[in-house]
């Protein structure tokens, strides 16, 4: 693939055009030794606790653009935190680009070790994946990243010993299994001991009973549900948080009976009193007497949550009739290959069949199915006034995804900056999602690596894309949040459970002299971005919900305007037989990975009640502070272009796209506000943060449609014409006589 696109540099004897050697000749390196030395001495700024492991000099970082090859000469280094290239940023490749949206932790030439997806070596123009010990070392290194960057390094002019050292070091530190305590996370925490900022003033962390009580009061759920501390110190279960919420009649002994399994745990309460609950499956038993004990236990739990004042319960078994983790993993592996492009030629070679490849990956359909299931759950909560109980083996994957999606759609608070971050803390971090395994940070099991959280962010992006004014944060916020999964200075996404975090951070240490380590959370955005860059994370078009006085609040306490006109279906109870079916062998078999064949084709349509609910909602004007439903028809589910296409220059629209529209809207809003201030003659009446255009957006004609990540990327000089269509246009001479044709890529 690399050779076909002309990426093969030195050693390319078959290439008809000049190879990379013709641009950087060995004699130039020797005659300009002083200049090269000066370029190589770019300072490597190490983070606290970061250690240099290996390095190589006279490495060329290059990009491939059809017939031209441009590169930077510098050093390639590997630390216990990242791979970094130190070169002359003023070279022709960057062309004087200003980096306004700069990450303070990760530079443009830095790759966190956890962000490396695959490493390839180029041998005689053939690209091969690199694993373990090598007998022969490549002349080029190609690194595919989990944030979908593709970086090329030429090692042709590097000393042989340095090549062996840097290649072996990178392979070892990015692919070898690791122990948790050997992660850079702990080195950094020890080096900055006690200096971590506390973001609790804005984001609810849900690590104290007070936080849970506050959430119960906010959602009016405190009448039927209570906060319990039976697991304080993780005495009952290391899978659950120290504090959580259960139905009020539930006894502590019930929680202890099966180590927190088989217990309905509260997620969120609807304005009409119904609630979203989740439950993990009981242990698999073969003995009939043990199964009978489990059934009796569940019968008692079911009766507890099925009698007044609790609503009727509908169970949703996510393991038998929804997505499997294997399906998500397989689909994303196919999907991401569409964006890991090695060259411009490769991009155009796949252009004609791109949509077919996109469809065959199934990723967009998985997103649609998640949104559809969330709508069906919402219909039960909102229209049928039923409690919904989500069932899953550990209640820590698809339960997290669907419960979070439902809350984003139903609760306007979860669409605010702090509300969304608090939601992730509650449902994902405290909910026990296995970030360490699902992101494969320790490289111990590739089978466990499943992008469930990324799938959630992609679903939220669909909502942000369809209803921009409803969210206080932007798609850029979601993009950098997805990137933060692989930055090991934040504890948020590097543990499988609160118990694992507290244990390894020393909070359960019996040594009185041993102080627990303190880590940053990802929610302290000042660690990564300056205030100017942070303005791009907040939506200037978002308007806060107006506060009502007491008289107004009484009249609209439970129903917001949109739902008053929706048909309410009579509540129907779930038959008991359906409840017990989930915790037996049938549930366990599905939880262990049984693939559901042809589920995509059989689940295209919403159920009748949900379809009526969905159509009624979309027939009325949108209340951005009320219930929010996405369009889920095929064409409405789109590719998250900013995240997936941001490193591909050919996929950009220079001076166009949504960023241009946003720039014009902000200019109009600023003008209107200026006129209002002049009329009222109150120049300092209030700060205009929410309507002030970030300076970078003022000249949108200079920006890319994939701003702010691709603002100054060099665009290919080649005519925008797929290479697969060249043969149909005749020979090369005939093609040269034709005028260039412009093909509009449109909205991806």
Swiss-Prot record:
A GO term for molecular function: phosphatidylinositol-3-phosphate phosphatase activity
Kindly list the places in or outside the cell where this protein is found, as annotated in its UniProt entry.
Cytoplasm; Sarcoplasmic reticulum; Cytoplasm, Myofibril, Sarcomere
The entry's family comment says: Belongs to the protein-tyrosine phosphatase family. Non-receptor class myotubularin subfamily.
Outline the extent of the Myotubularin phosphatase domain. Answer: 206-644
Role description: Acts as an adapter for the myotubularin-related phosphatases. Regulates phosphatase MTM1 protein stability and possibly its intracellular location. By stabilizing MTM1 protein levels, required for skeletal muscle maintenance but not for myogenesis.
Please list the residue ranges that the record marks as compositionally biased, kind Polar residues.
563-573
Q: Where is the composition biased (Basic residues)?
A: 553-562
Q: Which gene encodes it?
A: Mtmr12
What name has this protein been given in UniProt? Answer: Myotubularin-related protein 12
Where Phosphoserine occurs, the residues are 565, 602
Q: Which keywords does this Swiss-Prot/TrEMBL entry list?
A: Cytoplasm, Phosphoprotein, Sarcoplasmic reticulum
Record region (Interaction with MTM1): 450-559
Spell out the subunit comment: Heterodimer with lipid phosphatase MTM1. Heterodimer with lipid phosphatase MTMR2.
Q: Does the keyword Kinase apply?
A: no
Region called Disordered, residue ranges: 549-576
- What transmembrane ranges does the database entry give? none
Record-level GO cellular component terms: cytoplasm; membrane; sarcomere; sarcoplasmic reticulum
GO BP terms: namely: phosphatidylinositol dephosphorylation
Organism domain of life: Eukaryota
């Amino acid at each position: 693939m690399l050779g076909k696109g002309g990426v093969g540099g030195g050693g390319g004897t078959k290439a008809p055009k000049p190879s990379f050697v013709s641009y950087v000749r060995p004699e130039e390196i020797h005659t300009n030794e002083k200049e090269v030395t000066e370029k190589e001495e770019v300072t490597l700024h190490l983070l606290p606790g970061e250690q240099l492991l290996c390095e190589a000099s006279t490495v060329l970082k290059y990009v491939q653009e059809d017939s031209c090859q441009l590169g930077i000469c510098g050093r390639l280094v590997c630390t216990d935190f990242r791979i970094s290239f130190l070169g002359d940023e003023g070279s022709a490749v960057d062309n004087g680009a200003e980096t306004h949206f700069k990450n303070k932790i990760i530079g443009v030439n830095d790759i966190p070790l956890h962000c490396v997806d695959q490493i390839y070596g180029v041998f005689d123009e053939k690209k091969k994946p690199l694993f373990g010990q090598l007998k022969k070392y490549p002349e080029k290194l190609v690194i595919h990243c989990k944030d979908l960057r593709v970086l090329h390094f030429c090692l042709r002019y590097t000393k042989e010993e340095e090549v062996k050292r840097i290649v072996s070091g990178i392979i070892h530190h990015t692919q070898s299994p690791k122990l948790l305590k050997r992660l850079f996370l702990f080195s950094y925490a020890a080096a900055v001991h006690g200096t971590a900022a506390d973001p609790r003033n804005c984001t609810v962390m849900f690590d104290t009973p007070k936080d849970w009580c506050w959430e119960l009061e906010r959602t009016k759920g405190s009448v039927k549900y209570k906060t319990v501390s039976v697991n304080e110190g993780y005495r009952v279960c290391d899978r659950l948080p120290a504090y959580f919420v259960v139905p009020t009649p539930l006894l502590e002994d019930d929680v202890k009976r099966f180590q927190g399994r088989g217990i309905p745990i509260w997620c969120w309460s609807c304005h009409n009193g119904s609630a979203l609950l989740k439950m993990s499956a009981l242990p698999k038993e073969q003995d009939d007497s043990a199964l009978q004990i489990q059934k009796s236990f569940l019968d008692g739990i079911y009766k507890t949550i099925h009698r007044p004042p609790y609503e009727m319960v509908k169970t949703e078994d996510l393991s038998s009739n929804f997505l499997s983790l294997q399906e998500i993993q397989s689909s994303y592996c196919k999907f991401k290959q569409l964006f890991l492009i090695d060259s411009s030629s490769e991009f155009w070679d796949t252009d004609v069949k791109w949509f077919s490849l996109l469809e065959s990956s199934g990723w967009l359909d998985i997103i649609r199915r998640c949104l559809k299931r969330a709508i069906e759950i919402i219909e039960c909560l909102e229209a049928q006034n039923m409690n919904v109980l989500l069932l899953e083996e550990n209640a820590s994957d698809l339960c997290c995804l669907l419960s979070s999606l439902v809350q984003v759609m139903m609760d306007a608070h979860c669409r605010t900056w702090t509300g969304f971050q608090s939601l992730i803390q509650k449902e994902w971090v405290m909910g026990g999602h296995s970030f360490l395994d699902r992101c494969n940070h320790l490289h111990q099991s590739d089978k466990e690596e499943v992008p469930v959280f990324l799938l959630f962010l992609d679903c939220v992006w669909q909502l942000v894309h369809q209803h921009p004014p409803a969210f206080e944060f932007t798609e850029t916020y979601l993009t950098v949040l997805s990137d933060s999964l692989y930055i090991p200075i934040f504890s948020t996404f590097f543990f499988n459970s609160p118990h694992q975090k507290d244990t390894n951070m020393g909070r359960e240490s019996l040594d009185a002299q041993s102080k627990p380590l303190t880590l940053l959370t990802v929610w302290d955005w000042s660690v990564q971005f300056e205030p100017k860059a942070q303005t791009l994370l907040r939506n200037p078009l978002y308007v806060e919900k107006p506060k009502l006085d007491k008289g107004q609040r009484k009249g609209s306490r439970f129903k917001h305007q949109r739902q008053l006109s929706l048909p309410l279906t009579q509540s129907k109870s779930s038959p008991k037989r359906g409840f017990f079916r989930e915790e037996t062998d049938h549930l366990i078999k599905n939880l262990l990975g049984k693939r559901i064949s042809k589920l995509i084709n059989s689940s295209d349509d919403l159920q009748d009640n949900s379809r009526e609910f969905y159509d009624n909602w979309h027939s009325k004007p949108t209340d951005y502070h009320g219930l929010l439903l996405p369009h889920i028809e095929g064409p409405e589910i789109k590719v998250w272009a900013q995240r997936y296409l941001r490193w591909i220059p050919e996929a950009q629209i220079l001076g166009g796209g949504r960023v241009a529209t946003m720039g014009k809207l902000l200019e109009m809003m600023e003008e209107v506000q200026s006129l209002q201030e002049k009329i009222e003659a109150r120049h300092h009446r209030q700060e205009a943060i929410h309507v002030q255009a970030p300076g970078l957006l003022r000249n949108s004609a200079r920006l890319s449609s994939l701003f702010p990540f691709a603002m100054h990327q060099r665009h290919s000089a080649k005519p925008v014409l797929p290479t697969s269509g060249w043969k149909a246009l005749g020979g090369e001479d005939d093609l040269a006589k034709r005028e260039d044709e412009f093909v509009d890529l449109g909205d991806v």
